[in-house]
Regions:
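Bacterial N-terminal signal peptides
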Residues: 4-15
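Contiguous beta-strand/loop segments that form the cofactor/metal-binding neighborhood of enzyme cores
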Residues: 216-291, 318-330, 349-351, 367-368
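Conserved SAM-binding strand-loop segment of SAM-dependent methyltransferases
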Residues: 75-81
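Active-site loop of classical SDR/Rossmann-like NAD(P)-dependent oxidoreductases
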Residues: 36, 59-62, 307-319
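Beta-strand-loop-alpha-helix segment that lines the small-molecule cofactor/substrate pocket
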Residues: 88, 93, 99-100, 104-151, ...
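Predominantly a Rossmann-like dinucleotide-binding segment in NAD(P)-dependent oxidoreductases
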Residues: 151-241, 358
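N-terminal Rossmann-like dinucleotide-binding module
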Residues: 19-71
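C-terminal helix-rich "cap/oligomerization" subdomain common to oxidoreductases
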Residues: 21-22, 93-95, 323-368
Length: 368
């Protein structure tokens, strides 16, 4: 006789859970319009239910007007002053499309308002700035995430999964190719090109612009362990076009039992972002965003396959950011997390020093 009331209570509890509303879209503000990747965000926003755009901070009124017209944005969204926007709107997160040099300034300002940040790769231009960003995140208990296009490639996720599951045996060598024909050659806009080719505002040329991708992937593959040493060679093959920065680099990362070769360049004949992982018993090569070439121990020839799709909340930057802010994902040790990207900056900083001095740089432990 007591079973029926219990069943009724269980049914009511289940109905109540099912009736709970879905997570509301996160409120985001764009800070800066000088990084061309903002165009991808604005183009995708109307189809993305994870976020609501509440403000855009851009002091260049002509550039702000250009974007307002191109993307049919209300003038009420725009603000020329960062602090005023943070105070008046208090978004859940800021999406930072400034120069890389400006990342620290924006992140620290947002953190003081307990607002999280997502920046475009890389995290910063210097190790000092990276550590200052980490201090701000810790002090104010906010998230700082770094957006890489390749994070949302299912091919990379599958390659990392196979490596970490032992399917390839011990990973011995990783080769990463990233880049394109050059920013000027592909038509980067006038608001972007000057600072992208400035060693102060961008940190370096192709070395930072595309070297960060491989450093990010390798740091996750090595479970957050930094390399023992970094050796880098850079050069400028097109000095008339890029007189102040490198346009081609090769970086060797040495680990206790593995080696990575990163090949960032603005001199590729076409755009590419691919990775080769070689283990003791197999290899996997990523092809574009969702395909792989593989060969495992005992197989006589190479095979091709499509990577399984990513979970919905890890399929793009906005879905991921919303999942983090809603507490569904803890960004620890993944491609986007701050701890991973502190190591990425350690690698890039050492690579820049190595290229400048002609010496291999042995990495020292970072302050906690």
């Amino acid at each position: 006789m007591k079973l029926a009331p219990l069943l009724l209570l269980a049914t009511l509890a289940t109905s109540a859970l099912n009736a709970q509303p879905e997570n509301k879209p996160i409120r985001v503000a764009i800070v800066g319009l000088v990084h061309g990747h903002v165009k991808g965000f604005l183009a995708a926003l109307p189809k993305n239910a994870n976020a609501q755009l509440v403000a855009i901070v851009e002091p260049n009124t002509a550039l702000a007007q250009q974007y307002a017209s191109q993307y049919h944005l209300s003038q009420s969204l725009f603000d020329a002053d960062l602090e005023h926007m943070l105070t008046s709107q208090h978004p859940d997160a800021v999406l930072v499309y400034t120069t890389i040099k400006d990342h620290r300034r924006v992140i620290e300002a947002a953190a003081k308002h307990n607002i999280s940040s997502m920046v475009e790769k890389p995290l910063s231009t210097t190790m000092d700035d990276a550590l200052a960003i980490r201090r701000a995140a810790r002090e104010h208990h906010v998230q700082v995430l770094v957006n890489y296009e390749t994070t949302w490639y299912s091919s990379n996720a599958e390659a990392i999964s196979e490596a970490q599951s032992g399917k390839l045996g011990d990973v011995r060598k990783v080769v990463v190719h990233d880049g394109h024909e050059g920013p000027k050659e592909i038509g980067v806009g006038p608001e972007w090109l000057p600072w992208l080719t400035d060693p102060i505002q961008n940190g370096a040329g192709a070395l930072f612009d595309f070297g960060c991708y491989g450093a990010d992937l390798m740091t996750v593959l090595m479970h957050g362990q930094p390399p023992i040493s970094v050796t880098a060679v850079t050069q400028t093959d097109k000095p008339a076009t890029y007189p102040h920065v490198d346009d081609d680099a090769t970086v060797i990362l040495r680990y206790a039992n593995a080696q990575a070769v990163l090949m960032p360049s603005w001199d590729w004949p076409f755009a590419r972002k691919d990775m080769e992982l070689y283990g003791a018993t197999g290899y996997v090569i990523t092809v574009a965003s969702d395909n792989l070439r593989t060969r495992y121990h005992g197989e006589k020839s190479e095979s091709q396959k499509t990577a399984p799709p990513l979970p919905e909340n890890e399929s793009n930057s906005l879905a991921y950011l919303a999942a983090v802010l809603h507490g569904e994902i803890k960004p620890q040790g993944d491609l986007t997390s701050l701890d991973t990207n502190i190591i990425v900056m350690q690698i890039l900083d050492a690579a820049r020093t190595s290229a400048k001095t002609g010496r291999t740089i042995e990495l020292k432990p970072l302050p906690e």
